[in-house]
From Swiss-Prot:
The record marks R21 as: Transition state stabilizer. Homododecamer. It comes from the Bacteria. The keyword Amino-acid biosynthesis applies. This is 3-dehydroquinate dehydratase. Belongs to the type-II 3-dehydroquinase family. Its EC number is 4.2.1.10. InterPro entries: DHquinase_II, DHquinase_II_CS, DHquinase_II_sf. PANTHER family: CATABOLIC 3-DEHYDROQUINASE.
Length: 151
């Protein structure tokens, strides 16, 4: 894959607290460690990975509007259950995306089991901890490679 391929990684509210926030649900790895490992994985595939974590919905929306990425990996965190605006931003740019969650949202409280994104996502990965991000990146690379072959 050429170096012009770009993937945008977005992480929503409270994910800056990974490693110390409810490690029973979210694991012990920090977001910085996860992003570093993903950056290495992307670099090995000759792909550019841009990352933004924000607790502010509008910053995530602005990043989606401004991106020239060919793929988005998003962990909307608590916005999963509340943000029609973030959903509309993703639909508005028509960039394929994968939704990632560290915990198994389906095994948690009922309010966490609804997503405004999953019906529009290329795929959803949940419950696999930090490993889920790596699987999402692999799936994104595979999707982009398949798309390139079809062109």
């Amino acid at each position: 894959m050429s170096t012009t391929v770009k993937i945008l990684l977005l992480n929503g509210p409270n994910l800056n607290l990974l490693g110390r926030r409810e490690p029973g649900h979210y694991g012990h790895q920090t977001l910085a460690t996860i992003v570093s490992e993903l950056s290495t994985q992307a670099q090995q595939a000759s792909v550019s990975l841009e990352h933004l974590q924000s607790n502010a919905e509008h910053e995530l929306i602005d990043a989606i509007h401004a991106t020239d990425a060919q793929f988005i990996i998003i962990n909307p965190a608590a916005f999963t259950h509340t943000s029609v605006a973030l959903r509309d931003a993703l639909l508005g740019v028509a960039i394929p995306f994968i939704e990632v969650h560290l915990s198994n949202v389906h095994a948690r409280e009922p309010f966490r089991q609804h997503s405004y994104f999953s019906d529009k996502a290329l795929g959803v990965i949940c419950g696999l901890g930090a490993q889920g991000y790596k699987f999402a990146l692999q799936a994104a690379l595979s999707h982009l490679s398949d798309k390139q072959l079809q062109s």
